[in-house]
Swiss-Prot record:
Disulfide bonds: none annotated. PROSITE patterns: RECA_1, RECA_2, RECA_3. One of its GO terms (cellular component) is cytosol. SMART domains: AAA. This is Protein RecA. The lineage of its organism: Bacteria, Thermotogati, Thermotogota, Thermotogae, Thermotogales. GO terms for biological process: DNA recombination; DNA repair; SOS response. It is found in: Cytoplasm. ATP binds at G68, Q69, E70, S71, S72, G73, K74, T75. It holds the Pfam family RecA_C. GO terms for molecular function: ATP binding; ATP hydrolysis activity; ATP-dependent DNA damage sensor activity; damaged DNA binding; single-stranded DNA binding.
Amino acid sequence: MSDEKQKKSVLEKALKRIEENFGKGSIMILGDETQVQPVEVIPTGSLAIDIATGVGGYPRGRIVEIFGQESSGKTTLALHAIAEAQKMGGVAAFIDAEHALDPVYAKNLGVDLKSLLISQPDHGEQALEIVDELVRSGVVDLIVVDSVAALVPRAEIEGAMGDMQVGLQARLMSQALRKIAGSVNKSKAVVIFTNQIRMKIGVMFGSPETTTGGLALKFYATMRMEVRRGEPIKEGKDVIGNVISVKIVKNKVAPPFKTAQTYIIYGKGIDREYELFNIAVEESMVERKGSWYYYTTLKGEEVSLGQGSSNAVQFLKDNPEIAGEIERRIREKYGLLSVEKEEQKKEEKSSDEEAS
């Protein structure tokens, strides 16, 4: 027997023993087509952010961190993710460590309150134990922890005011994430942590900004999104919302450092049609002629969206089939079709080849 065949035989026996001891799938050949699957995602609820992620949303089986300053839209993005997971028939949980969830606002964003799992834990250990249990159950698709800054260790709560508790929260997060990271990949759940920005004292060079909870979350997170509040959105003299910018500062499933701009309306969440309209204009799918906007359908028909951007956006709200077609074309351009749609297209292609 040649050395090459002998090595192959020994390797096959070793792989077989590993699978017998630790279960099927505990070790695999990466190039095996049956093992390599497209990245499954839960949409973010924003087309612009879906594009920035590079895969069309939050990757399943991974940990995601959304961080930013106060009132920058972190919880809004998390609630939109819950609404999207529920639309797909999934189960979502909200760990309200801040004890600040507004059910009316969540409902306005499309969250089904009747099926939403919610917990308002007494301390950080309890919150993270609940997350771990939900992940290990294997039936929860999305878990949101709002927020890391509010995960106060039990020792700090039970201690007196002014007691020094150095690094307690960082150690808690490090220990919990070691447990959660291993099981989240097997369960195909998405765990989203929202986090706040703090200022480091005495920093002379570089950014003085940092996030709470130590370094563990930065390490274990597959995707980290920085959210910043931009200029206000006005209707006449009244401020009705804010432009927010999102930067993907870490991404293990696609190229990082992409940015997105979206629009949050107070009490309503992301203005999807306004966002869609702006992207369609940038991609030249919607054409401007003077002050009028036009869209040419896949059938070749030119449709007038209206005079001025506000009328064009209203047209998209009144005609969801046109808005849906534009969104599908944009997603197809960026390769963001869902796994189900891609598999359906492959099946249609193979059936066409067989017929021919």
